[in-house]
Design a protein with these regions (language model features):
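Contiguous, well-folded functional domains in the mature portion of proteins
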Residues: 1-264
Length: 264
């Protein structure tokens, strides 16, 4: 019994510290201290209980090693999951194409090329130079943590008039050239009245952006169009005919959160 209490205490402390560290490094919600943290503690605790008679004094060591392993497996489940959410479909609204938190909301004036920013570093999205975006417009940056769904959905219904992929290089998003040189994919959707752009940017050691759609295809609002495997960022280009409905640091959810609504 004393051994089990020791294991439980060590596992709880290690798991809690792990999620606090992840919160500091990746800005995940503190709610995971009560969700995934508890699940990790219960799973590792149960394994330790079942194995205590087989490994005896090694129970503590095994439990310590299992915490990050179980935590990683749980994160992968969250990462690749298809969320069971009823999609929000509103022809007068722009729905978030990604899970994550809002890191900036900037206005783009006529004649300017959209700029994407990550950790204070700004890069020009040159692919928009030849696209007739309805200026002025907004650009909203969404940072996706390892705990967010990394599948992306269309913010509006319409026709994909641009779908450009850039292979990029293996650079950390902390690198000043990351946004310009890391792999990214850009689509622009035209609903006959407005055009909305979505830019998917990969993180270091990733280069794994998967796109399910092609230029010329018609898409429904909240339809899955791609995925960024592992760390990433999504930028949304929105016409100023829309009123922004989110704020900085807000957590948003793909197919669920309304980013902007058409002005009356």
């Amino acid at each position: 019994m004393n051994l089990l209490l020791l294991v439980a205490g060590i596992v709880a402390l290690e798991s809690s510290l792990m999620y606090v560290y992840l919160h500091k490094k990746t800005h995940i919600s503190l709610s995971y201290l009560y969700k995934d943290n508890l699940i990790v503690i219960l799973i590792v605790g149960a394994i330790g209980y079942l194995l205590q008679n087989l490994i005896d004094e090694w129970t503590v060591v095994v439990a310590i090693c299992l915490v990050p392993v179980v935590g990683l497996l749980l994160t992968m489940v969250r990462f690749f999951r298809f969320p069971l959410r009823k999609p929000v479909r509103n022809e007068d609204a722009i729905v978030s194409p990604a899970d994550g938190n809002i890191i900036y909301i900037k206005k783009i004036e006529k004649g300017d090329v959209p700029m994407s920013t990550k950790e204070g570093v700004t890069a020009t999205l040159h692919e928009f130079a030849n696209v007739e975006l309805p200026y002025p417009c907004w650009i909203i940056g969404i940072n996706m943590t390892p705990f967010d769904v990394h599948r992306n959905a269309t913010p509006i219904a319409g026709k994909i008039i641009m779908n450009k992929h850039f292979d990029g290089k293996f650079l950390s998003l902390k690198n000043p050239n990351a946004i310009a040189q890391n792999e990214r994919n850009t689509i622009v959707i035209d609903n006959g009245v407005h055009q909305v752009g979505v830019v998917q940017t990969a993180s270091k050691l990733v280069k794994r952006i998967v796109t399910y759609k092609q230029a010329g295809e018609q898409v429904e609002q909240c339809e899955w169009f791609g995925m960024i495997k592992f760390g990433s960022q999504v930028d949304v280009i929105i016409p100023c005919d829309y009123e922004i409905a989110v704020e900085l640091k807000q957590q948003v959810y793909t197919r669920k959160t309304i980013l902007a609504t058409l002005k009356k």
